Amino acid sequence: MNKSNRIQTAELDWESIDGIEVPISKQFGDVYFSKDNGLLETRHVFLNGNDLSERLANLQDFEYFSVGETGFGTGLNILALWQLWQQVRPNNHSHLHAISVEKFPLSKADLIRALNVWDELKPLSKQLIEQYPLPLAGCHRLSFPEERFSIDLWLGDAQDIFPSMVKTKAVNAWFLDGFAPSCNPDMWEQNVLNNIVRLSNYGTTFASFSVAGVLKRGLKAHGIDISRPRGFGHKREMLKAIWKAPVSEEILFEPVSDTFHFTQQRIAIIGAGIAGLSTAWAFAQRGHQVTLFERTAPLSGASGNPLALLNPKLCPIEQSHEHLMTLSWQHALNFYKNFQAFRPIQIQQMALKNAQDLLDLTNQYPADIVTQQTSSLESDYPHIILTEAGAVSPHQLRDEILQHPGIELKIANITTLVSFENKVQLKSGNETTLEADHVVVCCARESAALFENYPLLKPIRGQVSWVDNSFATLPLHEAYSYGGYCMQLNTSELILGASFYPNRDDQEVLLDDHVHNFELIHSVFPHYAKQLPPVEQWQGRASVRAQSPDYFPVVGKMQNESRISTFAGLGSKGFLFAPLCSEVLVAQILGEAYPVPKSLLQKLDAQRFQKKVKPKKPYFKSQ
């Protein structure tokens, strides 16, 4: 990824033609869509050019069809694709996924203005605008499950992004867009085309308004058949292509599993903490049959606190495209807002150490995301305000997820997993409880009991406290982060957290931990802390988090061809990491597009510790 300070939004001029406002890029000196009629051009060039009406209408049950695009722009092509999907999609569980790249995204205000001219697309435009991402580099997944449609919008330079994409199932069709080659030559570089072909396969089609020599030569070099039918409006030609011929031996393709099937999968998930719940939801939303096993009760472990705070430690902005916490934060906000359990808030992050590094974020991130405002609580420490944050009620979220008709909860202690004939048997003692197509083990440190070699997860004791503060409540939409954290649990109680004791697995609520949590808030907000009742009157909950050796969650298959996966080691950021990591896990199992770059996928890989075995530093449980 190009080490720029931030994503630069598009600079636009506007030209009114027959009452239609046409945006023009100042960066590239070209229009975003045809002055004749951009929507009709999109249908002619990209939809008809890829024969999408017929192809989409004939998708099998549970088939996953993906369309790639080289320039998102105003989103017009994707909206036209979505509209076509509504018109022709079969009445089954097939899914349409779009992958688009944009170096200079429109601001939200400009996007609204640009799309306002297309009355027939307004119902779809509204949904797109609601999920339109913050202008931060990396992949932003927009999900519309009721439509069986999703978008991965990658912000950044195409020359950096396409090589970072990991191939699963091949992209089925491409919209080769992104301004004319004469205006934007970088988009049409051979490196970009090579990676577009790498992500494709025999049968993939390509369409473009451009018939420039650089594009034709680039595709022909890979054995792709090209035709030049009539273009739209005054344009004599357009490009239409299909990959039929064998590819050159010099092109190396990443191996793709042949085990992906267009059938409903029976998924068994062991463990009903936030990892298991979010994974169950991800599969069930795709129409698969999920059985969720829990030995005692859902949220009985570290996920069961009264409140979960989405409080990311943001990275320098040039690292945001592959920074797990930053990407997870954006994805989590988009995920949880669909639940009543979510409360949008802002977080005051105090600068206790390395203050300048934290304060510098206000010069890197957009001003409406990270600001320096006055505080509701008096403190001697500087701070920033993260305006896009949230709090989740875990038990309410659990109830909402378990209401999904595709999820069944069973209370059972699964002791053994046995693989056979493309199935996995789950056994409780000597009894077979279920046969599943895939199993995901989400049991934190106890996951190791179901694998031969499993990363050694460190126990970390933590205790949260809550206390009556009805005499001096804080705003419900604010939280405070200072090494610990505090915010309103409800209208009359303050919740404070959390103690942090590595290599301890005791779970008794201790007065010492209440004292610890009091001392944390007192060190930053002494005037307010002195008003709180004595710690002897506090309530609390203690639990044990599971932390991997390198602090990244453990996500995926422990063996390449296995039907048994794991998702554990989320540490103290379970509610932050879980929604995005569950999408990564589902992508691996079902062969869907990954919502993260290769560099981050490698850091999450469940097999990564198998390459790091050291005699003096064991990464695995002892046998």
Curated annotation (Swiss-Prot):
What chemistry does it catalyse, as a reaction equation?
5-aminomethyl-2-thiouridine(34) in tRNA + S-adenosyl-L-methionine = 5-methylaminomethyl-2-thiouridine(34) in tRNA + S-adenosyl-L-homocysteine + H(+)
What Pfam families is this protein classified in? DAO, Methyltransf_30
Instruction: Note whether Acetylation occurs among the keywords.
Output: no
Q: Which cofactor does it need?
A: FAD
| Chief site of localization | cytoplasm
> For the region FAD-dependent cmnm(5)s(2)U34 oxidoreductase, what residue ranges are annotated?
270-623
GO MF annotation list = flavin adenine dinucleotide binding; oxidoreductase activity, acting on the CH-NH group of donors; tRNA (5-methylaminomethyl-2-thiouridylate)(34)-methyltransferase activity
Please cite one Gene Ontology biological process associated with this protein. methylation
Q: Give the classification, highest ranks.
A: Bacteria, Pseudomonadati, Pseudomonadota, Gammaproteobacteria, Moraxellales
Q: Give Gene Ontology CC terms.
A: cytoplasm
Alphabetically ordered keywords of this record: Cytoplasm, FAD, Flavoprotein, Methyltransferase, Multifunctional enzyme, Oxidoreductase, S-adenosyl-L-methionine, Transferase, tRNA processing
Q: InterPro entries, alphabetically?
A: FAD-dep_OxRdtase (IPR006076), FAD/NAD-bd_sf (IPR036188), MnmC-like_methylTransf (IPR008471), SAM-dependent_MTases_sf (IPR029063), tRNA_MAMT_biosynth_bifunc_MnmC (IPR023032), tRNA_MNMC2 (IPR047785), tRNA_S-uridine_synth_MnmC_C (IPR017610)
Region named tRNA (mnm(5)s(2)U34)-methyltransferase:
1-244
- Give the record's family classification: In the N-terminal section; belongs to the methyltransferase superfamily. tRNA (mnm(5)s(2)U34)-methyltransferase family.
What's the Enzyme Commission number for this chain?
2.1.1.61, 1.5.-.-
> Mind telling me what this protein is named?
tRNA 5-methylaminomethyl-2-thiouridine biosynthesis bifunctional protein MnmC
UniProt-listed Gene3D superfamilies:
D-Amino Acid Oxidase, subunit A, domain 2 (3.30.9.10), FAD/NAD(P)-binding domain (3.50.50.60), Vaccinia Virus protein VP39 (3.40.50.150)
Q: Is Oxidoreductase among this UniProt entry's keywords?
A: yes
Cellular localisation = Cytoplasm
